[in-house]
Amino acid sequence: MPPEDEWEEPDPDSLMRSERKHEWISEPRYKRMFDDIEHALQGVMGKGPFEWVDRRVFDQVFDRSTLLALHKLMEKGEIETIDHPIARGKEAHVFRATSANGPLAVKIFHTTNAVFKGLTKYIDGDPRFSGLSRRHRELVNIWVRKEFRNLKRMRRGGLRVPEPLLNQKNVLVMEFVGDEEAPSPRLKDIEVEDPAGVFEELLGIMAVIWQTCDLVHADFSEYNILSKDGELWVIDAGQAVTTRHPSAREFLVRDVTRLTEWARRKGHSAEVADSLGRVLDGPLPEL
């Protein structure tokens, strides 16, 4: 989470643009819907205890389509409140949320972000999503369903990934990985006492993804691994493709290369060719 001093006070013009952008909220057909869920969004409107949250987060993430999707999830009782952001990226913000059964992670994908145009290479060639529309909003919804299915497949393979619970338009609801205080830290942000052991475990995870799940993560790095109670969890599986994808091996080589580079930075000797061979057809770890 970025420090509070990275955020500047918005100028009056930007506030006026923000107001105009959300004028639709005052329309009668939407006002009742927004009134129903406004209390559940206090934490992401800068009115909760997390002071670094400001109106720009709301503007960037909570457009009409997203609010309608959240309203539907709240009507069904799947979500009670959206509490505060826990991660953000080019494609999505992730929020801690609360349900009747405890904390959740809610990943909201940006519906107006042009970066998705560069992600079609992870969809084109995936037989699970052939023949579907490539218009931007549909592309975002495809991406959400893709991450949902990839996480399901990885869990069936015995891997520790957040359990995907449901998706609605551009909103993905998942198991929250962390404790009552905070999400679990990324591998990037912790002190690794046994780099060789962690490397071997991650290589085994990568082998299970390839051999058992018939997938390539395609963005496997220290940024997308969480550490919880000494166990490693894989996250951000939206870009994962099947092993039948025409670029699957290219993505796998990239993943293995990143992992070996991480190991070397930590002082452990690792070679790409040997590591790649072990992922492709080496023995699998006991999970």
Description of each model-found segment:
Residues 7-84:
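Juxta-kinase regulatory segment immediately upstream of eukaryotic protein kinase catalytic domains
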Residues 84, 164, 219-220, 273:
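Residue-level detector of family-conserved "landmark" positions at structurally sensitive sites
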Residues 135-161, 167-168, 184-218, 223, ...:
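Conserved kinase catalytic-core helix
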Residues 2-3, 197-198, 210-217, 228-287:
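C-lobe/activation-segment region of protein kinase-like
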Residues 120, 184-189, 244-246:
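Short acidic, glycine/proline-rich loop/turn micro-motifs
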Residues 170, 224, 278-280:
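A glycine-rich phosphate-binding loop feature that marks nucleotide/adenosyl-phosphate handling sites
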Residues 50, 57-183:
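Conserved ATP-binding subdomain of kinase catalytic cores across diverse folds
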Residues 110, 178, 222, 227, ...:
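Short, glycine/acidic-enriched loop or turn micro-motifs at the edges of active sites
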